[in-house]
Amino acid sequence: MRELRVAVLIIAVSLPSFSASDRQGDALYDMKQKLNVTGNQLSDWNQNQVNPCTWNSVICDNNNNVIQVTLAARGFAGVLSPRIGELKYLTVLSLAGNRISGGIPEQFGNLSSLTSLDLEDNLLVGEIPASLGQLSKLQLLILSDNNFNGSIPDSLAKISSLTDIRLAYNNLSGQIPGPLFQVARYNFSGNHLNCGTNFPHSCSTNMSYQSGSHSSKIGIVLGTVGGVIGLLIVAALFLFCKGRRKSHLREVFVDVAGEDDRRIAFGQLKRFAWRELQIATDNFSERNVLGQGGFGKVYKGVLPDGTKIAVKRLTDYESPGGEAAFLREVELISVAVHRNLLKLIGFCTTQTERLLVYPFMQNLSVAYRLRDFKPGEPVLNWPERKRVAIGTARGLEYLHEHCNPKIIHRDVKAANVLLDEDFEPVVGDFGLAKLVDVQKTSVTTQVRGTMGHIAPEYLSTGKSSERTDVFGYGIMLLELVTGQRAIDFSRLEEEDDVLLLDHVKKLQREGQLGSIVDRNLNQNYDDEEVEMMIQIALLCTQSSPEDRPSMSEVVRMLEGEGLAERWEEWQQVEVTRRQEYERMQRRFDWGEDSVYNQEAIELSGGR
């Protein structure tokens, strides 16, 4: 009987915990439904699972209370669920970088434990709810780059714990509550706000500030003026990429002198302290190395809020203008925003280091999925390979034709195309690509790229252009079809060509293209689509850059427009070129024999 009472007591104590988890799970599942989550995203957010603490992107405490939900940059396009307000133990909520619309529910004011709320870069509208002023523990509030209107609620000024508030680039109006100017870091740029008497210059200038540990009022004024001058210089020197959702001047934060290297925002970029990235990557541990390219190693890292990042630690990077030139280049690259381009989210500079920070792509690279995957891991099927082809083409088209100045990648290959959680391709490693003027090519004393992917004119002259990237893209298409490397010396064992391009050309002439298709596809592909992709690849890899199509033409051909005409023209040229080559070869052989015969005659003559 005593044992029964103990068991009943244990069950009674446990029930509230399970009940709380169940309620939190219901709230999170409703959040998923309202966000219009599609595909395999959040597939483990199952309404039938009592405990949400096992769900992806959810962190709980020891009592099974949900304390963190991090769903940044997932492409969600729904609305915010009012039931989020039921998560009373939640401390961190991040939904930045999605396409969430609608307003912030009033119920968010019930998140009594919340310390960090990040809804930046969405499509949110309406007024900022006054109920957010009830969040007495809130330290970080980021609502920048949305479409909020109305005034800033006075209630926000009553949050004494607030250390960072960013409301930039909305449609806010009215007066900024005075106490918000006492927050250690704020940004109100890109609105129609009235500063009143609380700020040393007009609201029409850049409304951002980050304090140092002992900065004086003079430091504030000098930092502000310096920020304005720096912004004007950047605006005068460079034109930003076309098609940005917002065309106004970007915010620039000035790092006011302090004892610690602290994070600052450079537009939408974050400037990380060296120590932050050192901690995130476990002191740049070798076990966190994701890969190594021409510019340095890439490390996997985890930020304190659980966000996974990829940190590129640059080696042998030389910028004639020092840090200032590096920052200008980083700023230009950061505005190249496209669905199929890897977004730069931050950077770090010290006297001896240059680092770039990107979101972590959990499905790694196309090259990994083609050749380096582990047993049991899925390989890229044919529909996914087609998506890689068209997505990569669109990303490169954007760099070439929609950025001013245009951006030349210079190392297009399967290893530099990454895959997000939906296997959508994003072109990476263009972070330090040479920026060129519209009517100029790029000339460099050091050829950047990977053998087998480098266009012949770039290798021989050091001149790169958009058509240099087109060549590399063509080789990448051959990688997609064959699963093979651009250079593979093992092909010599079968007396085949070392270069993948030459190998494919030979099989194309012999009518044996079927033998080159990746065996991992298990014949689950469309023959006509494979042939089309190889045809486009061969058009892209013509020896003369003038003969190669532009990336916009490549996109159209992949969509079924204009390939037949280009291919027929290519075949005619190729036949003529082949005949000329064979004719020259015969002449060369004859001349060679004649020389040898003449030498024999001379040697056999009298001495």
From Swiss-Prot:
The stretches annotated as LRR repeats are 87-110, 111-135, 136-159, 160-183
The membrane-topology field of this record reads: Single-pass membrane protein
Keywords of this entry: ATP-binding, Brassinosteroid signaling pathway, Cell membrane, Glycoprotein, Kinase, Leucine-rich repeat, Membrane, Nucleotide-binding, Receptor, Repeat, Serine/threonine-protein kinase, Signal, Transferase, Transmembrane, Transmembrane helix
Which GO terms fall under biological process for this protein? Answer: brassinosteroid mediated signaling pathway
- State which ranges are Cytoplasmic (membrane side): 241-607
* Record GO cellular component, one term: plasma membrane
- So where does ATP get bound? 290-298, 312
Q: Where in the cell is it found?
A: Cell membrane
InterPro entries with a match to the protein in the record: Kinase-like_dom_sf, Leu-rich_rpt, LRR_dom_sf, LRR_N_plant-typ, LRR_Rcpt-Like_S/T_Kinase, Prot_kinase_dom, Protein_kinase_ATP_BS, Ser-Thr/Tyr_kinase_cat_dom
Q: Where are the transmembrane segments?
A: 220-240
| Keyword Transferase applies | yes
Q: Which residues form the Protein kinase domain?
A: 284-563
User: Where are the active-site residues found?
Assistant: 411 (proton acceptor)
MF terms from GO for this chain are: ATP binding; protein serine kinase activity; protein serine/threonine kinase activity
Q: Which residues are glycosylated?
A: 36, 110, 149, 171, 187, 206
Q: Which reaction does it catalyse?
A: L-seryl-[protein] + ATP = O-phospho-L-seryl-[protein] + ADP + H(+); L-threonyl-[protein] + ATP = O-phospho-L-threonyl-[protein] + ADP + H(+)
One Pfam family of this chain: PK_Tyr_Ser-Thr
Record bears the keyword Kinase: yes
Query: What Enzyme Commission number(s) apply to this enzyme?
Result: 2.7.11.1
| Family to which this protein belongs | Belongs to the protein kinase superfamily. Ser/Thr protein kinase family.
Role this protein plays: May be involved in the regulation of plant growth through the brassinosteroid (BR) signaling pathway.
Name assigned to this protein = LRR receptor kinase SERK2
Look up and give the organism this protein is from: Oryza sativa subsp. japonica (Rice)
